[in-house]
Amino acid sequence: MAKVPSRSPRKRVRKQVADGMAHIHASFNNTIITITDRQGNALSWATSGGSGFRGSRKSTPFAAQVAAERAGTAAQDYGVKNLEVFVKGPGPGRESAIRALNSVGYKITNITDVTPIPHNGCRPPKKRRV
């Protein structure tokens, strides 16, 4: 039987990124935080639903805070120190996600609101009658 040359397991070297971007998508139902490098390649991400919150608790500011802390600690393995924050959406987790990223230890250099605003595009959904 022929011997198969064994490959020694090589440890994957993570690229070191000093500056990153945090994209916070805060909808009424969930909050998604993605931390990327300057080119937009995702380093880490977390959601309120993936952090253990289900149903109406996903849309709370505390759930957004927990998700931002999880995404922030995962991105620290890449050496990210400074973050530029882009916030999209009207959800309740906007402010608390930014505060959580600050408390993890990131220096926030810029906060930009990139919420899409229609120039009278699609017709909005009808108003709720409760």
UniProtKB/Swiss-Prot annotation:
Please describe what this protein does. Located on the platform of the 30S subunit, it bridges several disparate RNA helices of the 16S rRNA. Forms part of the Shine-Dalgarno cleft in the 70S ribosome.
Alphabetical GO CC annotations of the entry are:
ribonucleoprotein complex; ribosome
**GO biological processes:** translation
Taxonomic source organism: Shewanella pealeana (strain ATCC 700345 / ANG-SQ1)
Q: What is the recorded name of this protein? A: Small ribosomal subunit protein uS11
Family from the record: Belongs to the universal ribosomal protein uS11 family.
Q: Superkingdom, according to UniProt?
A: Bacteria
Question: Does the record's keyword annotation contain RNA-binding?
Answer: yes
* Entries under PROSITE patterns matching the protein: RIBOSOMAL_S11 (PS00054)
Q: How does it associate, per the subunit comment?
A: Part of the 30S ribosomal subunit. Interacts with proteins S7 and S18. Binds to IF-3.
Q: Does the keyword Cell inner membrane apply?
A: no
Q: Which Gene Ontology molecular-function terms are recorded?
A: rRNA binding; structural constituent of ribosome
Query: What are the record keywords, sorted?
Result: Ribonucleoprotein, Ribosomal protein, RNA-binding, rRNA-binding
One Pfam match? Ribosomal_S11
